[in-house]
Amino acid sequence: RGVVLFCGPYDPTRMDFDSPYGGFMRTVIWSYLGTRDPADPRVADMSLLPHLTSAFPPTFISVGNADPLAPQSYALAEALEAKGVEVDTLFFPPRHEPQLGHEYQLLLSTRDGRLSFERFVAFLAAHSAAPAPAEADAGWRAVRRSPA
C-alpha cells in the first residue's frame, strides 16, 4: 500500500496565480470548480495538506527542479514527514543540470527520467502485495539499458 505523486498541485491556496504558470492553474481550478477565481473559498477545499494524518500511506514524491509546482511537492513532503508518514522523495538541487521541468519523469530517454522510473518501481516493489511478473522485470531491464 502506498501513493506515488509526481509534480502535482497539492495546496492551491499556496500558489502564485499571477506567475507565468498562474494562467494554467486558473484553468485547473476552473475545470474542477467552474470558476477561474483563486479567491473562491472552494479552492481551499482542494488542498490536501489540512487533511493529512499519520494514517496517510507511505508516499513517493518526485518533482523536477525547474517545475513551477516544485514548491507544492516540497511542502507536501515536509507536511507528511511532520505527521510521521514514511516519505521517499526524489528531488534535485536547484542547480542540477539539465533543468527538469514538469513531468520530467515521463522522459525515459533521459538519465533523470530513468532514475525516477527506477525509484518509482523500487517503491512499488517495496509497498505492493505481490511481486511483479517476470516479464515486467525483463521489460524494465531493457529500459534501464537504453542509451542516455
Located regions from the model:
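Alpha/beta-hydrolase superfamily serine-hydrolase fold, recognizing
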Residues: 1-148
